[in-house]
């Protein structure tokens, strides 16, 4: 009887965490060491339609999805792929996997979550070093005196995010729809941005996408030969309404910049 490995993750979502979760699940299944069970959770408002039954790479995941998180026994291993505030140590050995952060500080609750796990994995040395060096003073609510230091006390390692070279590779084969869209671009030099445009006013959205548009327009305005900015972005819903909201944001930013602006 194989040991049970329960993976709690947004495995069905069209999100960065979803893609990483699917990579982890496929690797565990291919390893064939554990009885892999998968409990799918949401990731914000991102659609949960990333898995396709007719895709063999997805079917191995779909076949292991749980309808109920209750198992016949405590899992030997629990892998929780979310932000650390949500980490739950429900297994005999618990691994937290998080993308971490893009800055130099996190909430104290992140460290509390990491300390619940036996091992924490992050995708880059920057994230590892940042989380390893963050600490907070703990103040006693009753006496208002220092009661210690809150810091990460559990093993923290880097597990880099790989790439599927069956998809991401040089090729001379392009879909008709892609060719049709690219043919609409007149500029000879183009920048490509891929990422979410999340909530927040200009300069306050998490990925700073709005400021990217602003700086691009201000940098290349009034040039005789301008580059273009191609954006593969969305809010969270991947809908027509989402697209229109993105276009309105771009329009509002460009409206506040004088000059002959790039596309």
Where are these regions (language model features)?
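N-terminal subdomain of nucleotide-sugar transferases
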Residues: 1-45, 51-54
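Extended catalytic core of nucleotide-activated donor transferases of GT-like folds
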Residues: 6-8, 45-131
């Amino acid at each position: 009887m194989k040991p049970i490995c329960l993976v709690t993750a947004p495995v069905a979502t069209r999100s960065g965490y979803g893609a990483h979760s699917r990579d982890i699940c496929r690797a565990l299944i291919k390893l064939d060491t554990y009885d892999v069970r998968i409990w799918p959770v949401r990731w914000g408002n991102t659609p949960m339609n990333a898995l396709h039954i007719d895709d063999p790479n997805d079917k191995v995941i779909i076949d292991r999805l749980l309808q109920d998180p209750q198992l016949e026994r405590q899992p030997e291993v629990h892998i929780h792929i979310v932000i650390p505030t949500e980490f739950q140590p429900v297994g005999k050995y618990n691994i937290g996997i998080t993308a971490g952060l893009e800055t130099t500080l996190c909430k104290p609750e992140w460290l509390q979550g990491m300390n619940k796990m036996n091992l924490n994995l992050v995708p880059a040395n920057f994230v590892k070093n940042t989380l390893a060096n963050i600490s907070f003073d703990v103040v006693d609510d009753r006496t208002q005196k220092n009661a210690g230091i809150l810091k990460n006390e559990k093993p923290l390692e880097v597990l880099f995010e790989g790439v599927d070279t069956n998809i991401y590779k040089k090729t001379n084969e392009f879909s008709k729809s892609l060719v049709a869209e690219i043919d609409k671009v007149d500029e000879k030099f183009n920048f490509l941005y891929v990422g979410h445009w999340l909530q927040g006013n200009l300069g306050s959205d998490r990925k700073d996408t709005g400021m990217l548009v602003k700086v691009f327009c201000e940098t290349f305005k009034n040039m005789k030969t301008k580059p273009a900015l191609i954006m593969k972005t969305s809010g969270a819903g991947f809908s027509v309404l989402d697209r229109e909201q993105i276009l309105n944001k771009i329009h509002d930013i460009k409206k506040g910049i004088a000059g002959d602006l790039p596309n």
